[in-house]
Amino acid sequence: MKYDTSELCDIYHEEVNVVEPLFSNFGGRSSFGGQIITVKCFEDNGLLYDLLEENGRGRVLVIDGGGSVRRALVNAELGRLAVQNEWEGIVVYGAVRQVDDLEELDIGIQAMAAIPVGADSDGIGESDIRVNFGGVTFFSGDHLYADNTGIILAEEPLDIE
């Protein structure tokens, strides 16, 4: 499904929170949306493998990487795993790598930057917790909509037909 965050903001201005414009699109989908699962991990993507192995139909993984752009949390392998398990998208408050490969995948991926250095994979982090970045607080179960213009968040799903 295609999402237009500008139009959604016009219609649902009272119901949505707008994430500060810190992100760029690195995935093959220009827009994506769904119910979010949150994870907090700093320069370590081990936990992301476990989460992305789950069925992601209708879901978006929101990763609070502390805003670090020193190491990439999402790589092509994680992107392919997410596509295989039908995730709608990934938002990374941090960096990604292997961007040419990510761009070929049928998934939305928004991140702050790209860097060739990979993350540790010790599995350090927490999931299903409140995370805050870009001027917005994210809770697992909220609904996120993203396109090349921006990212918005709503507590309930928006009627988009």
Swiss-Prot record:
InterPro entries: RraA (IPR010203), RraA/RraA-like (IPR005493), RraA/RraA-like_sf (IPR036704), RraA_gpbac (IPR014339). Disulfide bonds: none annotated. GO terms for biological process: negative regulation of RNA catabolic process. The keyword Cytoplasm applies. The keyword Nucleus does not apply. One of its GO terms (cellular component) is cytosol. SUPFAM superfamilies: RraA-like. Keywords: Cytoplasm. It is found in: Cytoplasm. GO terms for molecular function: endoribonuclease inhibitor activity; enzyme binding. Homotrimer. Binds to both RNA-binding sites in the C-terminal region of Rne and to RhlB. Belongs to the RraA family. Globally modulates RNA abundance by binding to RNase E (Rne) and regulating its endonucleolytic activity. Can modulate Rne action in a substrate-dependent manner by altering the composition of the degradosome. Modulates RNA-binding and helicase activities of the degradosome. This is Regulator of ribonuclease activity A. It comes from Edwardsiella ictaluri (strain 93-146). The lineage of its organism: Bacteria, Pseudomonadati, Pseudomonadota, Gammaproteobacteria, Enterobacterales. The gene is rraA.
